[in-house]
Amino acid sequence: MMLDLGEYQEESVNIIAIMGPHGVYHKDEPIKELEAALQRQGFQTIWPQNSADLLQFIEHNPRICGVIFDWDEYSVDLCSDINQLNEYLPLYAFINAHSTMDVSSQDLRMTLWFFEYALGLSEEIATRIGQYTREYLENITPPFTRALFNYVQEGKYTFCTPGHMGGSAYQKSPVGCLFYDFFGGNTLKADVSISVTELGSLLDHTGPHLEAEEYIARTF
């Protein structure tokens, strides 16, 4: 199941860096339209001054989820520099009919997508960027964490732990409301025991628990 972070993407990993402007209408106007479309989908956008500024931002701000740039100006060199910092970060290169596509098989292993400069396609491109962002978050999220996020987002409840009915039991009194507001709804909705079948079994080593164990073994 694809991880859907739509409910809290606005305050999560949702920043798109845009390299530009370029001083020519046929490039700047499509990117301006795309920026507006991305913002309507809940993304924040920033405009780094240059490639060095961009790399500093990526290194120190993990909430960035993609980079839009002009292929003719930055080419694969910028991609390689970004890849050294975050090999999973989606990169969106914009080209025109005269762009030179000098890309090796090694470069194609990057999370790199190409779009053509064109007016009137901003909504479609923004939708695709949204999908690539969800794939990015899916790839960087550990198996059990991903399963727990999905469990909470599906609105499921369990009576086996203090998060009774997603924490609604705490909202029966003033102090309970203060407690709920302090920790937040997701904390209480995710407060589950090892008996939740959707999350697998910690005792039998099945499902997301097993996937998490295998992930940890590969990582460490």
PLM regions and their residue ranges:
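Residues that mark the start of a beta-strand
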Residues: 12-16, 44, 87
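Alpha-helix termination/capping residues and helix-transition junctions
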Residues: 10, 60-61
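Non-catalytic signal-transmission and effector/linker regions of two-component phosphorelay proteins
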Residues: 1-14
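N-terminal cationic-hydrophobic initiation segments that often serve targeting/anchoring roles
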Residues: 39, 58, 82-86, 217
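A short, well-structured beta->alpha microelement
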Residues: 2-3, 35-60, 76
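N-terminal glycine-rich, Lys/His-bearing helix-loop that initiates the first secondary-structure elements
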Residues: 31, 50, 54, 62-192
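Conserved N-terminal alpha-helix of the aminotransferase class I/II PLP-enzyme fold
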Residues: 181-220
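Conserved acidic segment of CheY-like receiver
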Residues: 12-28, 34-38
